[in-house]
């Protein structure tokens, strides 16, 4: 039976990737359907109750800059906010919010309900409607068929998901939810290259059984930062502290004694886990020289009786989990409310995707989130936004869009996946971005909001606020450039008292701001009239631009140099066997990845500068350059 309505875009899965995908498609005007197993779990935080962090916060800001929901939901649900790396340079500073799970889920549901052009339907998807090599809709478990121009799969850990606790295991998409076994089988039958990954979660603990007095308190920042460029502190719920404790040698002895019943160390689990978020048993084995590991004790919510012990993800048997938890300071009398577990699931080789996140093997089918081998809410949400946008554009026969590595962390994320692939869950870090000085959290709106507006993602309210901010930045910069100080003036004496190098020539306040020992607060103290009506975000942008102008200019010059490679397009049908001089290994890699540009080809592991030179010679000789 076919559903009455047809859609431009169908999104399968209501997690962080799915919600952003559905919202992005609908914001551009596409008739969008979001299909989920359970509408009550839309936007659910399946693992840790937090948004942001190093590299991840940058993605959240970029999602927000393009009209996405994640940052606004974090502002409405955040019960502790911190700026990580606050003492370091602006490129690596990152916002992190501890979130109330219930409030976050509520904010996501309200955002979905308020979105025009978006419908919700609760059913498990078991099959795709395929016409030739094109996706044309989906089929649900009760045989209901939905037709659409494009389909976006954002199915998280549900594809053939299997949950492990000790040597016991069972099918599941996450604790309490069934897996998507039929859909996983169908995708395998369609010829997609599949492998297995695993992730895990720690046991939850009854907060009433925890002695917080034996732990170190970790309060949030004051004043609290906001996540969204449109956010305000007034939106934040009451703020609370987290706590820190540590494992000890007794903890490690218990873990080592239980390894003979660990699914990881007995070969039961075959999937590869996240390198940068390993289980506690993995940490104890890999870092045997360490006598303790830090645990962040995080509240699950203002009204929740559960806490999340971040740092002891485990799939050990329950009796070992309980002994391990009670060996930790502050947890001596702890009661576990839910055991930790590991989950194995299918993912598909992201090198089989285009930069738009459309699959190469099947037209009109897009993948986003953990199905592509990533880990983390933020990585999933960013992919969801891109896939939803491009599915909507494909449905209307428009060209796809994606950001470059020099434009957004989202561009770095997608290019890494498409070009390099991954054999382990991929997590974003600032170190993955070669142009991180220009890809800061603080300027995500300046980088992406204008593009988002052109793509139909940014509404009038956000655009108006952005234009006002951009104008204020230009105004303040012009004011500082116009106000000048002569070395023989009375003002120069007060400036010389602030700096190690006396003023030798006439200089503008903007030039003075470039000095490392002069801050904007010094200038504001001497010329407060210049700062009337200028908020903190505007002042911050002007100061960063002044302080780092030389570094930014050099990075921009490097970006322009590299862009020349990106301008050389490579046809998808290119026969690399005809490129004279390439080794068989290089030909195989180029044929496997099928890079879209010479720049992407240069980033494929094992492709040498000599091979790129041969490729350029071939392009010029054949008239393709």
Curated annotation (Swiss-Prot):
Provenance organism: Methylococcus capsulatus (strain ATCC 33009 / NCIMB 11132 / Bath)
UniProt binding sites for FAD: 13-18
Predominant location category: cytoplasm
UniProt-annotated location(s): Cytoplasm
A GO CC term attached to the entry: cytosol
Swiss-Prot/TrEMBL cofactor(s): FAD
Species classification: Bacteria, Pseudomonadati, Pseudomonadota, Gammaproteobacteria, Methylococcales
Name of the molecule in the record: tRNA uridine 5-carboxymethylaminomethyl modification enzyme MnmG
InterPro entries (UniProt xref): FAD/NAD-bd_sf, GIDA_C_N, MnmG, MnmG-rel, MnmG-rel_CS, MnmG_C, MnmG_C_subdom, MnmG_C_subdom_sf
Protein family according to the UniProt entry: Belongs to the MnmG family.
SMART domains cross-referenced by the UniProt entry: GIDA_assoc_3 (SM01228)
One Pfam family here: GIDA_C_1st
Primary role: NAD-binding protein involved in the addition of a carboxymethylaminomethyl (cmnm) group at the wobble position (U34) of certain tRNAs, forming tRNA-cmnm(5)s(2)U34.
Keyword NADP: no
Any GO BP: tRNA methylation
Assembly description: Homodimer. Heterotetramer of two MnmE and two MnmG subunits.
A Gene Ontology molecular function term of the record: flavin adenine dinucleotide binding
Keywords: Cytoplasm, FAD, Flavoprotein, NAD, tRNA processing
Binding-site list for NAD(+): 273-287
HAMAP family in the record: MnmG_GidA
